[in-house]
Regions:
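A short, basic N-terminal segment
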Residues: 1-53, 379-381
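Mid-core helix/loop region of P-loop NTP-binding domains shared across ATPases and GTPases
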Residues: 7-16, 21, 93-214, 224-240, ...
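Walker A/P-loop nucleotide-binding motif
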Residues: 49-74, 93
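Conserved catalytic segments around the Walker B and adjacent sensor/switch elements
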Residues: 54-56, 79-93
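Post-Walker A helix-loop "phosphate-sensing" segment adjacent to the P-loop in P-loop NTPases
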Residues: 74-84, 110-112
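AAA+ ATPase "lid" subdomain C-terminal helix
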Residues: 241-246, 254-268, 304-308, 324, ...
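Conserved C-terminal helix/linker of AAA+ ATPases
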Residues: 259-284
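Terminal-proximal interaction/regulatory segments of ATP-powered molecular machines
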Residues: 307-381
């Protein structure tokens, strides 16, 4: 069946539109093989009666952290279901202690706990007794863990998971913390940080070649043959690589395909991609901005208001500190976070103390950031 017959039959250029979904899990995930091997070694002690090792999965958004941990958990549950229980929790959706332990409860018992009328202690007790009775280890992946920083709820959750053995002898638990915050350990209470003792597994941004190969694979799986040219795919790859967010490229493919279908076209043309650029970039930027803390948003908003090129970190600190009293160490951590998320670029000037002064420049247009930053809530009088 040629492309024309396929279109006449299905009225679509998509072979499988699901491969462009944000929650799609590829059958193979070779690009993060080394990171998955590190995580697998952390699970091995649990298969022999020991305690799983804790990990921090650290990297900018859209670098494969979520996919890697989900694929590993999928494999572990198939091969080692008698020894280990793997629970993935999206903390953006479940950001309370009850919500997170409800997900653990659901994984173990196959249904949610009652939402009312049952104290948390009873749910917690049932989970831990089940682990004790079955002699299975529990490993919990907490994704987008920055959503637990408010009110330091993260320390409560870590404490309840990692110190379970103190009340339930022999219970074995571990945590995979998935995040992009370089200063994660500053959040934890000391008594929790001392028992977390996690190894860092780093997910660096994809190279241009890796980005192209991932997008090419999605094209092959998601579109019928010859729907998009290599030239357009390379243009999307370049745009994706420069913006440092793989989700942007996957969205561009999906939106470009939709644009072509609106025109009743069998192929994606340049105009379809150009139109998709305007939609997709704002969506990706908004996702990154929503991951910032309120104080990081305040600093970024201040930088956009200044809208100066090549301002030094020292000059920026002096001006920012006049309006927002902040210690230099805290300010420096926030700047590093903004750079880590590729919202700003920094380059060393060669001057300043020990030559460590940096120029700071926005990677995005000031107006675009301001339009996508969530509005600050006004304090009620």
């Amino acid at each position: 069946m040629d492309l024309q017959d396929i279109l006449l039959h299905d009225e679509t250029i998509f072979k499988d539109v699901r491969v462009f979904n944000s929650d799609y899990l590829p059958e193979e995930f070779k690009l993060r093989q080394s990171q998955m091997e590190e995580m697998a070694f952390s699970l091995r002690p649990a298969l022999h009666g020991g305690k799983p090792s804790n990990n921090i999965l650290l990297g900018p958004p859209a670098t494969g952290k979520t996919t890697a941990v989900k694929k590993l958990f999928e494999m572990a549950q198939l091969d080692c279901e008698d020894d280990i229980i793997c629970v993935y929790v999206n903390c953006q959706l479940h950001s309370t202690k009850f919500g997170i332990f409800s997900q653990i409860y659901k994984k173990i018992f196959g249904h949610n706990p009652p939402e009312t009328g049952v104290p948390f202690a009873r749910i917690y007790n049932k989970i831990m007794n089940e682990l004790y009775d079955t002699d299975k280890a529990l490993i919990v992946a907490l994704d987008d863990i920055n959503h637990l920083f408010h009110g330091n709820i993260i320390s409560q959750i870590f404490y309840d998971i990692l110190r379970a053995h103190e009340s339930y002898e022999g219970v074995r638990t571990g945590i995979f913390a998935v995040l992009s915050d370089v200063e994660f350990r500053f959040i934890l209470d000391k008594n929790v940080g001392s028992i977390f003792n996690a190894a860092e597994i780093n997910f660096k941004p994809y190279t241009y070649e890796e980005t192209y190969n991932i997008l090419k694979e999605r094209v092959n799986l998601g579109f019928y043959p010859n729907v998009i040219s290599n030239d357009l795919l390379e243009e999307i790859t370049t745009y994706t690589f420069e913006n440092g967010d793989l989700r942007l490229g996957i969205d561009l493919l999906r939106i470009s395909g939709n644009n072509a279908e609106v025109r009743a076209s069998r192929r994606i043309e340049y105009g379809d991609v150009e139109k998709a650029f305007k939609v997709s970039k704002s969506v990706s930027l908004r996702y990154i901005l929503n991951s910032l803390s309120d104080k990081e948003k305040t600093l970024l908003r201040f930088i956009t208001r200044m809208d100066k090129k090549n301002i030094t970190s020292g000059q920026l600190y002096e001006e920012y500190n006049r309006e927002n009293k902040i210690g230099y160490a805290t300010y420096n951590r926030q700047i590093n976070k903004l750079e880590f998320l590729r919202l700003i670029d920094t380059t060393y000037t060669g001057s300043g103390k020990k030559g460590n002064s940096r120029y700071i420049n926005l990677r995005f247009d000031s107006k675009q950031i301001q339009e996508n930053l969530p509005q600050q809530k006004r304090r009620s009088l």
